[in-house]
A protein has these predicted regions:
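Active-site scaffold of zinc-dependent metalloenzymes
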Residues: 44-85, 94, 100-101
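Pan-zinc metallopeptidase signature
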Residues: 149-240
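Active-site catalytic microenvironments for nucleophilic, acid-base chemistry
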Residues: 17, 97, 101-102, 129-137
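Metalloprotease/metallohydrolase-associated module, dominated by Zn2+-dependent proteases
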Residues: 114-177
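A metal-dependent hydrolase signature that marks the N-terminal structural subdomain at the beginning
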Residues: 1-63, 211-215, 234-237
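Post-HEXXH active-site segment of zinc metalloproteases
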Residues: 84, 99-127
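Membrane-embedded glycan transfer/ligation machinery
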Residues: 88
Length: 240
């Protein structure tokens, strides 16, 4: 585990590298959450952002706290083992800040709609993809990483985890270590029908990241992405 001092020393480097790619992008305050005072520091930041409560996803390495009084990024000392891990975690959270949240798209997360499904995939995809565009030397990465993410996305029977599916697409499109052959191997891990949807979703994401401001989605894109995900989910639920 890195020390608080070590983590803080890497924050300015993360900001410099990020803003060299995303010129003019603003940065929100970053707070290092000590392992020994995780709950207290996290609660303080939540209150400063104007929230009374935000569910704590133990095991996450960093997160954006977004409330009526502003945004802050929390990075957790207990999860930080290397400099590159700190950098990548911060770039990922900077990506979340850059791309915004569901409110700007008018999405009600309590309603099951294609827009919500599309946002669920795009939200994590774009943050992770942005991190790769800054520097794709992600810790622990290798060409097999995409296969692991794909397997995790479909690990539970008759369901799909959109978080791991988003990470899968981000590593396929953003990690230079993943070749076309590596991607093609994925078809051996899922059914032909599911693989067809994987390719359709990939093509939709490729079209999006070709845009100069790819991190800003529109309703048509999210609807298309969400419909594809929902159709694939139905196939998996039915046992495909």
């Amino acid at each position: 585990m890195l020390t608080i001092t070590e983590i803080k020393s890497y924050i300015s480097e993360a900001i410099t590298q990020y803003q060299s790619v995303y010129v003019g992008a603003d940065i929100v305050p970053v707070t290092v959450c000590p392992a020994s005072r995780r709950r207290a520091v996290r609660n303080r930041v939540i209150n400063e952002c104007g929230l009374d409560y935000k569910e704590d996803a133990y095991g996450t390495d960093a997160e954006v706290i977004f409330g009526p009084n502003g945004k802050q990024i929390l990075i957790y000392q207990s999860m930080m083992k290397t400099k590159q891990q700190v950098l990548h975690a911060l770039w990922h959270e900077f990506g979340h800040h850059l791309s915004g949240d569901e409110k700007q798209y008018g999405i009600n997360l309590e309603r099951d709609t294609p827009m919500r499904s599309g946002y669920a995939v795009f939200n994590e995809f774009v943050a992770e993809y942005i991190a790769y565009t800054v520097n794709d030397a992600e810790p622990f990465r290798n060409a097999m990483g995409s296969h692991i993410y794909l397997q995790m996305a479909f690990h539970e029977e008759r369901t799909i985890n959109p978080y791991w599916l988003s990470r899968y697409f981000a590593i396929v499109l953003g990690d230079s270590a993943v070749s076309e052959d590596d991607f093609a191997f994925g078809q051996s891990l899922v059914s032909p029908a599911v693989w067809n949807y994987i390719n359709q979703i990939l093509n939709v994401l490729i079209s999006q990241i070709k845009k100069p401001d790819f991190w800003i989605a529109d309703a048509e894109f999210l609807e298309t992405l969400g419909c594809l995900f929902d159709e694939m989910f139905h196939l998996v639920f039915m046992g495909a």
